[in-house]
């Protein structure tokens, strides 16, 4: 009889678009989209906070566009489903405060020379270090625990908005624990160990109805059957009651869900949030190009799993450091992969913005602000496009 394989449990969580922190991310990115749509050179650092009956937008924005911030706030909240005080916020009647100033002239001269620098000369908008990660355990080259938690959240919103589960309200959280096997550095998912869903609901529905609907309409369509077995544990609204939600239940802030936005606890994170930031902010553009690099390494067959780190100094275009680790799964040494990465990718912020087409607004950034920035199949997510990496397979 074969010896039992050594496995471990790893958990990732997600929140859906009605969670107050995620609502703030979406408002900040809706503002960014509006600024870039009118003026692609807009410099945006937009934060949002919310509590009962209140949304405040604040930060530094320099744009030639004429942007109606209050209108954007109300429309974004309305689209999420916050249309009455009962569900957590009334988009049409809540108080909206706007405190927006221009970008500091000190930062402007150092980063883009008050818009006089050529793209290749534009410096990083701040110091910091960013990570990109990829793994061959899913078609998206993303961690399964994160993919499932994220898709459960997206599905919750889908069945709320299409009327399948009319008792649902906008706020909700999901969490998935996966049992993994470590195959010499590569991650191999064996099964789903635990599924947790806590979703806001109306007064009329019973806990039994909630559990039955979540299993049938949310879990079943999202989690492949091969990962579920008789031992899988389900915690469905384990607190017993979740009627009060959204900003009425909890305060919300932009940039408080950075692990949900990225890799669900896998890889690493430099700490900088994404939403509300234009592409000169390397917290965002640096993390996007690092994901493209890591994904390209795995997709090109150079490694089964990979992390890429880059770092910057404010006002300096070239990264200070680039680091690659393939967790022992590389087909050639990591130092050789690093050389290929440096030859293939341009990590200067102005060039990232051009090569990934990051100066385009519309609803591009709003889409990123819920259900993850990575692993999405959407042409606007340009950093998900694999760059083929040329390498010589070592002789066997």
UniProtKB/Swiss-Prot annotation:
* Up-regulation conditions: By salt stress. Follow a circadian regulation with higher levels in the light.
Record's subunit section: Homotetramer.
Q: Mind telling me what this protein is named? A: S-adenosylmethionine synthase 1
**UniProt superkingdom:** Eukaryota
Name any cofactors this protein relies on. Answer: Mn(2+); Mg(2+); Co(2+); K(+)
**One GO molecular-function entry:** methionine adenosyltransferase activity
The UniProt keywords, alphabetically, are: ATP-binding, Cobalt, Cytoplasm, Magnesium, Metal-binding, Nucleotide-binding, One-carbon metabolism, Potassium, Transferase
The metabolic or biological pathway listed in the UniProt record of this protein is:
Amino-acid biosynthesis; S-adenosyl-L-methionine biosynthesis; S-adenosyl-L-methionine from L-methionine: step 1/1
* Reactions the enzyme catalyzes: L-methionine + ATP + H2O = S-adenosyl-L-methionine + phosphate + diphosphate
EC number(s) per entry: 2.5.1.6
Family the entry assigns: Belongs to the AdoMet synthase family.
Which GO cellular component terms, listed alphabetically, does the Swiss-Prot or TrEMBL entry include? cytoplasm
Query: InterPro entries attached here?
Result: ADOMET_SYNTHASE_CS, S-AdoMet_synt_C, S-AdoMet_synt_central, S-AdoMet_synt_N, S-AdoMet_synthetase, S-AdoMet_synthetase_sfam
User: What organism, scientifically named, is this protein from?
Assistant: Beta vulgaris (Sugar beet)
């Amino acid at each position: 009889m074969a010896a039992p394989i050594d496995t471990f449990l790893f958990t990732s969580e997600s929140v859906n678009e009605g969670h107050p922190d995620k609502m703030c991310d979406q408002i900040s990115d809706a503002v960014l989209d509006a600024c870039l749509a009118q003026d692609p050179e807009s410099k945006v650092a937009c934060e949002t906070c919310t509590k009962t009956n209140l949304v405040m937008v604040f930060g530094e924005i320099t744009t030639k566009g004429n942007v109606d911030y209050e209108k954007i706030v109300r429309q974004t909240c309305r689209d999420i489903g916050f249309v009455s005080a009962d569900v957590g916020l009334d988009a049409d009647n809540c108080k909206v405060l706007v405190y927006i100033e221009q970008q500091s002239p000190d930062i402007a001269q150092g980063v883009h020379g008050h818009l006089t620098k050529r793209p290749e000369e534009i410096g990083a908008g701040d110091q910091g270090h960013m990570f990109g990660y990829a793994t061959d355990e899913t078609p998206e080259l993303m961690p399964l625990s994160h993919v499932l938690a994220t898709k459960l959240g997206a599905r919750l919103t889908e069945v709320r908005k299409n009327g399948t589960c009319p008792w649902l309200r906008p706020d909700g959280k999901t969490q998935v624990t996966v049992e993994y096997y470590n195959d010499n550095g590569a991650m191999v998912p064996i099964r789903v160990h635990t599924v947790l869903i806590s979703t806001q609901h109306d007064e009329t529905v019973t806990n039994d109805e909630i559990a039955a609907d979540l299993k049938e309409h949310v879990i079943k369509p999202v989690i492949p059957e091969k990962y579920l077995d008789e031992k899988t544990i389900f915690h469905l609204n384990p607190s017993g009651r979740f009627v009060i939600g959204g900003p009425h239940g909890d305060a919300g802030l932009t940039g408080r869900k950075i692990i949900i936005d990225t890799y669900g606890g896998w890889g690493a994170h430099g700490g900088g949030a994404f939403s509300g930031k234009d592409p000169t902010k390397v917290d965002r553009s640096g993390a996007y190009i690092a994901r493209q690099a890591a994904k390209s390494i795995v997709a090109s067959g150079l490694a089964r799993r990979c992390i890429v780190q880059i770092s910057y100094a404010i006002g300096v275009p070239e990264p200070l450091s680039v680091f690659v680790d393939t967790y022992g799964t590389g087909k050639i040494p990591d130092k050789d992969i690093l050389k290929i990465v440096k030859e293939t990718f341009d990590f200067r912020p102005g060039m990232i913005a051009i090569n990934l087409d990051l100066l385009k607004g519309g609803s591009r950034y709003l889409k990123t602000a819920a259900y993850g920035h990575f692993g999405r199949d959407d042409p606007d997510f340009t950093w998900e496009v694999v760059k083929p990496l040329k390498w010589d397979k070592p002789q066997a």
